[in-house]
A protein has these predicted regions:
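Phosphate/adenylate-binding "loop-and-lid" substructures adjacent to NTP/NAD/dNTP-binding pockets
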Residues: 1-128
């Protein structure tokens, strides 16, 4: 879960918070469903997905519509992200796919195999 009560997030509008969570979820979805890789546990993905759904539900609808990826995530319910990449514009899909590749490469280069296994299997029994 992202703590928006700290700097610089403290001053973000709801649309900015929503856009931030949307981008993270899209990047992790591309990484998982299209690149067959992951750098976050299922539990973490679920927590930020539910945080996004709650924020979208409680904020003003006009504010929600201002979010960057509203057009692709207007009906996101937190259950799965498999279809999100296919909803993106060509430009956004290429841009976020590049980010996903970079994030995974950086994560892999900065962690050991043991650290990666521990991170991906946080709060689960056995390995995925």
């Amino acid at each position: 879960m992202i703590d928006f009560s700290k700097m610089p997030c403290l001053y973000w509008r709801d649309a900015t918070k929503i856009s931030y969570l949307q981008r993270r979820i899209i990047v992790y979805s591309i990484m998982y469903y299209e690149q067959n890789e992951s750098c976050v546990s299922d539990q973490y993905y679920d927590s930020i997905s539910h945080q996004l759904v709650e924020l979208q539900r409680t904020c003003d609808h006009a504010e929600f519509r201002r979010s960057t990826y509203y057009y692709a995530m207007y009906d996101f319910d937190g259950n799965t992200g498999f279809d999100i990449p296919s909803r993106l514009t060509k430009y956004d899909r290429e841009y976020l796919t590049n980010i996903a590749s970079h994030v995974y490469k950086q994560w892999k280069a900065s962690t050991t195999i043991k650290q990666r296994r521990r991170a991906l299997n946080a709060n689960t029994k056995g390995f995925r």
